[in-house]
A protein has these predicted regions:
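Solvent-exposed loop/turn and edge beta-strand elements of beta-rich ligand-binding domains
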Residues: 2-527
Length: 527
């Protein structure tokens, strides 16, 4: 019989999601003493189900008999009986329809497999079956002992066994990444990675405490997406905590925006495509963006890019300096087309947000601490008009000579002495810039350099030299400078000794001039 000729050449080849090496067979009828199937050493376990046995002629199975694990919903199956022509014709029909997906084709084939029966063989970790007769076999990926959770199960595989074969799985899993955007408040310029991908979405940024930080989550759908009838897709987001367990970011659910291949997706009253979860979470997550069934979005396909953008406010729990404030995500996804609810997840991906501090020491000309001063620090924010200066809250450290301003990022600043020490001259506003360099694309981005420089004009980078910022520890992210006040000059007052001296000196000079004048006239008269 030649009913399975096209099943061999089209259906079974198309359905396979495992590539298997098959030696070229000589023409003619073969039965053989049996062949083996070997499992890869990948932590997975495979059950082998025998559907048909028979002989091979010209690369096709003939004289088909029901196998050990066969069934037929329309009649009783007895191992070794001839397979009815109607069954073979049904299989050939589905193989000829190229519009059928792999899952649809498998739905027809699995009608003839009794999964309640004991598999003819189970193999794992490089093991091989014993000699199996020529026939059609279904291979089921049933279990995994992998500690790597970024793993998936293969769909059922159907194979004509007419040689020794080794299973070579081609499993597809999604990819995921997290990014952050870095915007300079004072210039309005967004950092771009010009050396790599020319993207504004990078792995590190710096922000002021109180700023809204823009984040991006991205997931790419796996290549075997069409083999699933239901597909779970969940972004898990975890924010760094301080020593008391409080988050350094405040997530803003109302800023969440979802796109699929660049097109925004919005929940409606009748269709809720995703859920923003902030309660009832596990594993220390702060929130989740859950697509319980991605199939609800009809435009999604294998390779689709799902992007979630949101803002979170950097709060007063933030870590100052090189340690930074980490924000981590991973993607949970369906990983077994034959078992709903089975999921894997991608490795964690982390971005870091840095913030810094300036410390102002009030001193006299001899660098001794000087009490009696008060300072206001402001930052310049560019907007659609001419920009504006916004005050920065001083840290209450209990000192009257050391002024700390924490939670700063790069930009233009103005330091104003609002009260000067008694007996000392006041100083004018001091303008300075903070500049920082951090790794833009890295699995563990770090702070490279941090400096602050006084400027002679507001919001320019022209350097002056009246104050100098230093950092005693490059890791702590603190920039320190001394601001010096000098005592006022002593000026003469009316009625004081200074006035008397002036009078005496004046009289002496007048008398002296008169004597010289008289003497000169007499000398001229004598001539």
């Amino acid at each position: 019989m030649k009913h399975l000729r096209k099943i061999v050449s089209i259906l079974l080849t198309a359905i396979m999601v495992l590539a298997m090496c098959i030696p070229v067979m000589a023409d003619g009828v073969t039965g053989g003493n049996g062949y083996t199937i070997t499992a890869p050493d990948n932590g997975h376990t495979y059950d082998i189900y025998q559907i048909f046995t028979g002989e091979v002629s010209g690369g096709n199975l003939i004289k088909e008999k029901w196998g050990e694990n066969a069934k037929n919903v329309n009649s009783t199956v007895k191992k070794g009986d001839t397979v009815p022509s109607g069954v073979l014709q049904a299989l050939e029909a589905v193989s000829q329809e190229i519009t059928h997906t792999d899952s649809e084709q498998l739905n027809v084939i699995t009608k003839y497999v009794d999964f309640n029966s004991s598999a003819i063989a189970t193999i794992t970790g490089g093991q091989s079956t014993g000699a199996l007769p020529v026939g059609y076999y279904l291979i089921k990926d049933v279990a995994s002992t992998n500690t790597n959770n970024n793993d998936a199960f293969s769909i059922y595989m159907v194979k004509l066994l007419n040689s020794n074969i080794t299973i070579q799985p081609k499993v597809s899993v999604p990819t995921a990444e997290k990014k952050v955007k870095d915007v300079n408040d004072s210039t309005g310029i967004t950092t771009v990675d010009n050396q790599n991908s020319n993207t504004e979405w990078i792995d590190s940024a710096d922000y002021d405490i109180g700023d809204d930080v823009p984040f991006q989550l991205k997931g790419t759908v796996a290549a075997d997406y069409d083999r699933y009838t239901k597909y779970k897709f969940v972004f898990h987001d975890k924010q760094q905590k301080d020593q008391n367990g409080a988050s350094v970011f405040n997530f803003k659910p109302d800023t969440v925006k979802v796109t699929v291949d660049g097109q925004e997706v919005k929940n409606t009253e009748t269709n809720k495509y995703y859920n923003v979860k902030t309660t009832g979470l596990s594993d220390g997550d702060d929130f989740e963006i859950e697509f319980s069934n991605l199939k609800q979005i009809s435009s999604v396909h294998a390779g689709s890019v799902i992007i979630v953008e949101y803002n979170a406010t950097l709060n007063s729990n933030a870590v100052i300096g090189k340690g930074g404030n980490k924000n981590t995500m991973h993607l949970e996804y369906s990983n077994n087309p034959e078992q709903e609810g089975s999921t894997g997840h991608t490795p964690d991906d982390t971005v870091i947000v840095f913030t810094y501090q300036t410390t102002i020491n009030k001193v006299d000309k001899d660098k001794n601490p000087l009490e009696g001063a008060e300072f206001t620090l402001e930052k310049f924010y560019k907007n659609e008009s001419n920009g504006e200066w916004r005050s920065i809250t001083k840290v209450n450290n209990g000192s009257s000579t050391v002024f700390e301003f924490a939670g700063l990022d790069d930009g233009y600043y103005r330091l104003t002495e609002t009260t000067h020490p008694e007996g000392y001259n006041p100083i004018g506003p001091i303008y300075f810039t903070i500049t920082a360099e951090h790794e833009l694309l890295s699995d563990n981005p770090g702070l490279i350099s941090l400096r602050a420089t006084e400027t002679t004009e507001q919001h320019t980078n022209k350097e002056a030299g009246s104050i100098t910022f230093t950092s005693t520890n490059e890791d702590d992210g603190i920039l320190t400078t001394n601001v010096v006040n000098k005592k006022g000059s002593l000026l003469p007052e009316t009625g004081g000794i200074g006035t008397t001296i002036f009078y005496i000196v004046g009289v002496v000079l007048v008398l002296g001039a008169g004597v010289l004048l008289v003497t000169k006239k007499r000398m001229n008269a004598d001539k």
